Regions:
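N-terminal leader/targeting and assembly helices and adjacent pre-domain segments
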Residues: 1-145, 153-154, 201-205
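Acidic, glycine-rich two-metal-ion catalytic cores of nucleic acid-processing enzymes
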Residues: 122-205
Length: 205
């Protein structure tokens, strides 16, 4: 289903463009202070706070729009509490908690900048890692808001649909077309997996 992640890709594009500008501005600000260590710590602290705020804002919009776009859907679209709980929970696919990971990335970026002469390279590396995490969690927000829409409307089973584009992994191929209870769907086999779910009438025996 080529359109399943259209909203996701729009959200990722918005966030990537914001992140590029924020990292560039942070790099320029740090350079003006000649990459003073304390200044780098302050610049990266502010940078990652702003990045996390951007993601929270756009992830919530994505979740709410995806919920309404999903058919069938209920009458309780995701709210901020829903999103914060999702981001604070341990994720079996990424193997970490988003709310802790962005802080770890902040600290790692600041440490890397302060411990090397290739400071611009470390800003770029930080951007790359942030963009990857943002993409993974945009997909997760899409999946979970879709499943919430199904559950709120009484859907009990879903079918696993693989992309079938020649790039899917062996696990995704093996799960293609399988029916799962909506509360017992196996975790996706890798971060960013774009297999998707559709309502199913009943479980196949």
């Amino acid at each position: 289903m080529s359109g399943f992640y259209d909203l996701t890709d729009k959200a990722i594009d918005i966030l990537n463009r914001r992140a590029v500008k924020r990292f560039e501005d942070a790099k320029d600000e740090a350079a003006l202070a000649k990459f003073d260590e304390l200044n780098v710590l302050e610049v990266t602290r502010t940078l990652y706070q702003d990045l996390a705020h951007d993601n929270q804002e756009i992830f919530l919009e994505l979740a709410q729009e995806r919920y309404q776009e999903t058919e069938p859907h209920g009458k309780e679209p995701p709210d901020l509490a829903w999103l914060l709980a999702l981001l604070a929970a341990y994720n079996a696919v990424t193997k970490y908690q988003y709310s802790h990971e962005w802080e770890r990335k902040r600290d790692r970026t600041a440490e890397a900048i302060n411990s090397t002469t290739a400071k611009v390279t470390e800003f770029r590396r930080g951007l790359s890692y942030w963009a990857q995490m943002t993409e993974w969690y945009a997909v997760e927000v899409t999946d979970q808001s879709t499943l919430k829409a199904f559950q709120d409307s009484g859907v009990r089973y879903v079918k696993w649909n693989a992309m079938n584009d020649g790039r899917e992994c062996s696990t995704c191929k093996e799960r293609e077309g399988k029916i799962y209870p909506i509360r017992s769907i196996p975790p996706k086999p890798h971060p960013g997996c774009r297999c998707w779910y559709t309502p199913a009438e009943k479980k196949r025996i």
